[in-house]
């Protein structure tokens, strides 16, 4: 029987999942409508892919977590954990791939450095960005092929994907190998976000020194962008902390509370960043406000009919 604390964690995780599906579903729907109107831009394509991959990732996180909590013995057969591992790699890497592409897009569009290479890349953003997206996709596919080889070799050797009695050191080494592509995308996103924050911070200081005592709209926009980026980095780090906790819990199966905490921490990123994107993107924000206004109007009409 679940304890009160465990019940609270499950409620939080389910709530995060619902918010994540709604938030990312809204982002995907808005951009799909633009696609139907032949207005889908590069950023729209990235946001749509990011939303779809995160919805898929949320379901994998919940499915894997609930299996480990309620029926951990199912994984002993080997086949299910093999499928979950493949789905996890696909969802995780595709989500990271689109998130990295989004970071690079904002970096090339917004950042301002005097470096010759950066200026060359910035002047050719429309050419460089598709190339970078394809490069990231190819690296993701190569990494997935490598992961498939690792899982297949281990299955052939042990007649199961994961031997639940394997040494912890061997298990963690294999997890690092499985997540090499994710670590690469995470590092690249982190670097681009940090450089973008530095660029915005420098530009903000210059504007404040030129216009003493005043904060124009551009300054406010730059401060807002820095807050969004810092929030993104914090959520990104929390996501990896949650992943590390969940991976470690696989070798300590009795500690359900720690596993639930890891699930809760991991699920913060997919739903939290979706709402940050909605609030930070003018098109998505306006669309969300229109939806809220429509809901308020429907509620008022319903109340009038009742009275």
Swiss-Prot record:
Expressed in subsets of taste receptor cells of the tongue and palate epithelium and exclusively in gustducin-positive cells. Residues 28-42, 122-126, 201-227, 279-307 are cytoplasmic. CDD domains: 7tm_TAS2R10 (cd15021). One of its GO terms (molecular function) is G protein-coupled receptor activity. Keywords: G-protein coupled receptor, Glycoprotein, Membrane, Receptor, Sensory transduction, Taste, Transducer, Transmembrane, Transmembrane helix. It is a multi-pass membrane protein. SUPFAM superfamilies: Family A G protein-coupled receptor-like. InterPro entries: TAS2R. It is found in: Membrane. It comes from the Eukaryota. Residues 1-6, 64-100, 148-179, 249-257 are extracellular. Glycans are attached at residues 92, 158. The chain crosses the membrane at residues 7-27, 43-63, 101-121, 127-147, 180-200, 228-248, 258-278. One of its GO terms (biological process) is detection of chemical stimulus involved in sensory perception of bitter taste. Signal peptide: none annotated. Pfam families: TAS2R. Belongs to the G-protein coupled receptor T2R family. PANTHER family: TASTE RECEPTOR TYPE 2 (PTHR11394), TASTE RECEPTOR TYPE 2 MEMBER 10 (PTHR11394:SF63). Gustducin-coupled strychnine receptor implicated in the perception of bitter compounds in the oral cavity and the gastrointestinal tract. Signals through PLCB2 and the calcium-regulated cation channel TRPM5. Several bitter taste receptors are expressed in a single taste receptor cell. This is Taste receptor type 2 member 10.
């Amino acid at each position: 029987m679940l304890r009160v604390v465990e019940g609270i964690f499950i409620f939080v995780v389910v709530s995060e999942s619902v918010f994540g599906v709604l938030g990312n579903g809204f982002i995907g729907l808005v951009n799909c409508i633009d696609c139907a109107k032949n207005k889908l831009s590069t950023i729209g394509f990235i946001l749509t892919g990011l939303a779809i991959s995160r919805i898929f990732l949320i379901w994998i996180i919940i499915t894997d977590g609930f299996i480990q909590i309620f029926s951990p013995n199912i994984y002993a057969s080997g086949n299910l954990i093999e499928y979950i591992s493949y789905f996890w790699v696909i969802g995780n890497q595709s989500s990271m791939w689109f998130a990295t592409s989004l970071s690079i897009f904002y970096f090339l569009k917004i950042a301002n450095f005097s470096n010759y290479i950066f200026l060359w890349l910035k002047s050719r953003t429309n050419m460089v960005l598709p190339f970078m997206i394809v490069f990231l996709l190819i690296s993701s596919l190569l990494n997935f092929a490598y992961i498939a080889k690792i899982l297949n070799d281990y299955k052939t050797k042990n007649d199961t994907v994961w031997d639940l009695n394997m040494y912890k050191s061997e298990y963690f080494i294999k997890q690092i190998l499985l997540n090499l592509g994710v670590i690469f995308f995470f590092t690249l996103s982190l670097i681009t976000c940090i450089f973008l924050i530095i660029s915005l911070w420098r530009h903000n200081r210059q504007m404040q020194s030129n216009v003493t005592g005043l904060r124009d709209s551009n300054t406010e926009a730059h401060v807002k962008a820095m807050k969004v980026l810092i929030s993104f980095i914090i959520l990104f780090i929390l996501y990896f902390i949650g992943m590390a906790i969940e991976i470690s819990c696989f070798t300590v199966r009795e500690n359900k509370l720690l596993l639930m905490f890891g699930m809760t921490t991991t699920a913060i990123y997919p739903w939290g960043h979706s709402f940050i994107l909605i609030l930070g993107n003018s098109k998505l924000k306006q669309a969300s406000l229109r939806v809220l206004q429509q809901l308020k109007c429907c509620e008022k009409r319903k109340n009038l009919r009742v009275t």
